[in-house]
């Protein structure tokens, strides 16, 4: 029953059309004024044929359909005074028209020929009513079956919707959990990144300060090296100048000593008498005062003056060098 989806619109239209054709056929047969014997006999034959056809079709349908797709028979109507014909399917309702159109030979041995035409008309009307009732009952039964199927489908649909909603809720919970975990990871990563950025900024500041100190130390080193070079040059110049002064002084002393030695040798060669020496001494007292001793004194004074001049020159040079070195230090401090 679960696999059968019910009657389609085309099948319902066919059923309705077959019912209308059967009603028209019954009305035509009633209006023709058939002979009672022939009608009764044809009715019996029709009942037999219908019963056989119905049994054969039901057998075919039961063989072709699955057990869950087979329909149960509707409840039988209450028993009447006359036997009712079996229920007809929509396909079987079109069969009586053909059989009624065929000529039927009267059967003299049939007991139904004694029925008058009025009773036969009443029987036909009852048969039509029974057919209508059976058709309505079948339609109601089919409607109930369709309603039950629709209920089952609705229940199945609601069940599937509930399952899908539960599944979606579970998936939504999983997604929220994953989002929370991702948010936690993002927060931890962002905090780590913030700490690293702060450390990088601090290290960059330290690097800039160290670079400035390095540049300052390098400038100081260059300035100190230049100052050392200048002072070494000044020292070398002063030592050279001092050596030259000492050498010149020694040369002057040597020349003076040679001159004095020459003068002494000349004086020793000219040895006078005692009287002459006395007279000469008396006469040359001022000369002796201004003689070699004076000359030696003059030489020493000259040497002292030259030494003082040289020392003054060296002092001025040293002072100039000191001023230059101080100016260089001041300029280096200004650059720093």
From Swiss-Prot:
Residues 26-118, 268-336 are annotated as: Disordered. Disulfide bonds: none annotated. Transmembrane segments: none annotated. GO terms for cellular component: Golgi apparatus. Residues 61-72, 302-322 have a biased composition (Polar residues). Residues 213-271 form a coiled coil. Residues 74-88 have a biased composition (Pro residues). InterPro entries: GORAB. GO terms for biological process: non-motile cilium assembly. Signal peptide: none annotated. It is found in: Cytoplasm; Golgi apparatus. It comes from the Eukaryota. Keywords: Coiled coil, Cytoplasm, Golgi apparatus. Belongs to the GORAB family. This is RAB6-interacting golgin. The lineage of its organism: Eukaryota, Metazoa, Chordata, Craniata, Vertebrata.
